[in-house]
Regions:
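Glycan-processing catalytic domains of CAZymes
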Residues: 1-211
């Protein structure tokens, strides 16, 4: 364990994307977090974009969806992504941002529009981040789907999605190639609720030194 990351979340996710005053508070908070991470010798943020409470990136759960289109929300959220990244880089220009989920989760169900995805608007926020990020910024798609992975083929397929397929899902493909890396999260006591966590017989755990 050589690197430290400060965890930051999007919860509770109740802030209105179009509320400038509220977003001023959000940006101030992340600016403070960036200073703490930098001065604390952290590599950067572990940015958990999972919607544990409200659907911050879900168009169907936006309070102004009856008066503003998906594209209008996308444009505003892209702006917020730029503002967020600029504020963070102001205090931490060489930050590494680990994302629990990247562009893949923003994709729509097959045959449907991105507006129907529960994380559809996340892609716009990430686009804004890429547009504004400093040359030294690294963004890592840490691919939470990999928590239970054991097989190399699973990692290979995920790597291809992050490094090749996801380039097609951003409006900033060149900056994506320059700034985005692949990284896989592993949940060491994965499935402990189902199989428990055995300290005497490691072979009974999802992950074992034998596998």
């Amino acid at each position: 364990f050589s690197d430290r990351f400060l965890r930051v979340n999007v919860t509770p996710g109740t802030t209105d994307w179009f509320d400038d005053e509220a977003w001023g508070t959000v940006l101030n908070n992340f600016g403070v977090a960036a200073q703490v991470a930098k001065q604390g010798s952290c590599k950067g943020f572990m940015f958990d974009v999972e919607q544990y409470n409200e659907g911050l990136f879900d168009y169907g759960r936006q309070r102004k969806r009856d008066s503003k289109t998906f594209d209008e929300y996308g444009a505003k959220i892209r702006q917020r992504g730029r503002e967020w990244m600029a504020k963070v880089n102001r205090h931490f220009p060489d930050i590494t941002v680990l994302l629990t989920f990247g562009y893949r989760i923003a994709g729509p169900p097959e045959g449907k529009e991105r507006s129907t995805s529960h994380y559809g608007l996340l892609a716009d926020f990430l686009d804004g981040m890429l547009e504004a990020c400093s040359k030294q910024t690294k963004i890592v798609d840490a691919w939470e789907y990999s928590y239970p992975y054991k097989e190399r083929t699973h990692f290979d397929e995920a790597y291809t999605t992050v490094k090749e397929k996801s380039v097609q899902w951003t409006v900033q493909p060149e900056k994506y190639r320059r700034h985005v890396q692949a990284g896989f999260g592993i949940w060491m006591d994965c499935r402990w609720r189902q199989v428990g966590w055995n300290l005497d017989d490691f072979s009974k755990n999802h992950f074992s030194y034998l596998t």
